[in-house]
Swiss-Prot record:
This is Crossover junction endodeoxyribonuclease RuvC. InterPro entries: RNaseH-like_sf, RNaseH_sf, X-over_junc_endoDNase_Mg_BS, X-over_junc_endoDNase_RuvC. Binds 2 Mg(2+) ion per subunit. The lineage of its organism: Bacteria, Pseudomonadati, Pseudomonadota, Alphaproteobacteria, Sphingomonadales. Mg(2+) 2 binds at residue 67. The keyword Ubl conjugation does not apply. GO terms for molecular function: crossover junction DNA endonuclease activity; DNA binding; magnesium ion binding. The active site is at residues 7, 67, 139. Gene3D superfamilies: Ribonuclease H-like superfamily/Ribonuclease H. Keywords: Cytoplasm, DNA damage, DNA recombination, DNA repair, DNA-binding, Endonuclease, Hydrolase, Magnesium, Metal-binding, Nuclease.
Length: 156
């Protein structure tokens, strides 16, 4: 089964694809979808949608795992993140994928063993779980972590 992990953001959405065969997990691909901060919001959302649709079409995942949104002190940032998340959820649904959402603390716990793990700890464990994988950046690393979290939870 191919799982698409997603870490939504308006500026840089991370994506990661893993293959699960029994208890074995292997890396397929990962990347980041960046939008132009100077572009109008609708144009940025269209770019995110188009790029995500291409990833889904190219790799034909069976399901998607998306990191849940967190609310911060800046309402504008939270709204922008919510817009991007909506596009990601819609794109996955349009692509025929079942979508499961995971809280960031649960993802960290699934990868490192503690929900309070730092990003560096998550990235280090990804190197152990997916040896030899070149990760496109921190957002792609988070997306791979979400995909692995889903792989672990669907076995239960």
């Amino acid at each position: 089964m191919i799982i698409l992990g997603l870490d939504p953001s308006l500026s840089c959405t991370g994506w990661g694809l893993i293959r699960v065969e029994g208890s074995r997990i292997s890396h397929i691909a990962n990347g980041q979808i960046k939008t132009d901060a100077k572009a109008a919001l609708p144009d940025r959302l269209v770019h995110l949608d188009t790029a995500l649709a291409a990833v889904i079409a190219d790799h034909a995942p069976k399901c998607a795992a998306v990191e849940e949104v967190f609310v911060n002190d800046n309402p504008q940032s939270t709204l922008k993140l919510a817009h991007a998340r909506g596009v990601v959820l819609l794109g996955c649904a349009r692509g025929g994928l079942t979508v499961t959402q995971y809280a960031p603390r649960l993802v960290k716990k699934a990868i490192v063993g503690t929900g309070g793990a730092a990003k560096g700890q998550v990235q280090a464990m990804l190197g152990v779980l997916l040896p030899g994988t070149k990760v496109a950046g921190p957002d792609a690393a988070d997306a791979l972590a979400v995909a692995i979290c889903h792989a672990n939870h669907r076995r239960r």
